[in-house]
């Protein structure tokens, strides 16, 4: 009888639903096609299938989410590889947990009809940015190739308003503009833009968007489940881009426009196919680049940058 009771109790426990783990995820920007694997994983129930209840948060300040993660006030954030190197230099307890976009997207964007035709033309100009630290670091490298330093330009924080501030003449160039988004945004507004691609002007190639967690979460198994969901969502997008676009705009109907359709198509080839794969060599090269340019004080052990 006792064995029967215990067996029934075990079956009842197995039948009871397991409470999903709540995970807060801070984005780097407002929702856009760069975040497609996250949105698709959410809409297809891929997070829920793995016992995760993911709260996706768009920031009011794009520099805020990684610091909230470091402070233990958020579980995970979408961030940038260059920013992670600098944040570790500051002593923030952040670790790479996966890759979302595996190529550079960032560029120095100028008006095609404007006065900046080469990097040396930036002397005396105003450069807009949205995230302090990482973008100013990249500007330093670009200016160096043009024979300039930060003292030769004026850096202006324009927050979200990258292409609008350029089109209005508030600034002469912007850093942090994504080649898959702002170029199209300007064209649709009737203004042609031109990008100086970082990786063609002395900056080593890097992962544009990554997931970061705090060190105390390094061994958390939910991170593996999260990244598995991202990998599956990415494959779904590649296999059925039109069907997944329909699902994406069903969740965010305000994004169903020409700008986002173009950005969706331009972004798909740049998603990390193996988001849990860490390219140590790439991180070593970028850390060396930052040190050579005086942006970090000493070489970083890249194994300590990852979970």
Predicted regions and their residues:
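N-terminal secretory signal peptides that target proteins for export/translocation
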Residues: 1-2
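Sec/Tat signal peptide C-region and signal peptidase I cleavage site
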Residues: 16-20
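Secondary-structure end/capping motifs
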Residues: 219-295
């Amino acid at each position: 009888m006792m064995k029967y009771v215990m067996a029934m109790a075990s079956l009842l426990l197995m039948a009871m639903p397991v409470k999903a783990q709540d995970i807060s995820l801070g984005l780097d920007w407002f929702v856009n096609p760069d975040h497609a694997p996250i949105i698709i994983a959410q809409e297809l129930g891929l997070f829920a299938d793995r016992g995760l209840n993911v709260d996706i948060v768009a920031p009011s300040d794009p520099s805020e989410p990684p610091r909230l993660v470091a402070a233990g006030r958020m579980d995970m954030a979408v961030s940038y590889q260059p920013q992670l190197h600098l944040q570790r230099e500051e002593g923030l307890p952040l670790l790479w947990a996966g890759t979302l976009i595996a190529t550079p997207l960032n560029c120095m964007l100028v008006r095609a009809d404007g006065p900046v035709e080469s990097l040396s033309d930036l002397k005396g100009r105003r450069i807009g940015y949205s995230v302090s630290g990482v973008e100013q670091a990249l500007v330093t490298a670009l200016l160096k190739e043009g024979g300039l330093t930060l003292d030769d330009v004026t850096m202006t924080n324009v927050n979200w308003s990258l292409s609008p501030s350029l089109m209005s003449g508030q600034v002469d160039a912007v850093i942090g503009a994504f080649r898959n988004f702002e170029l199209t945004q300007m064209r649709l507004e009737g203004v042609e833009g031109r990008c100086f691609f970082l990786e063609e002007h002395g900056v080593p190639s890097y992962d544009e968007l990554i997931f970061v967690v705090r060190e105390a979460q390094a061994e958390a198994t939910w991170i593996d489940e999260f990244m598995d969901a991202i990998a599956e969502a990415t494959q779904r997008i590649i296999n059925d881009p039109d069907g997944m676009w329909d699902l994406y705009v069903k969740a965010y109907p305000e994004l169903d426009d020409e700008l986002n359709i173009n950005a969706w198509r331009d972004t798909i080839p740049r998603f990390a196919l193996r988001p849990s794969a860490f390219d140590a060599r790439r991180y070593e090269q970028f850390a060396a680049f930052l040190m050579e340019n005086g942006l970090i004080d000493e070489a970083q052990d890249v194994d300590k940058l990852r979970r």
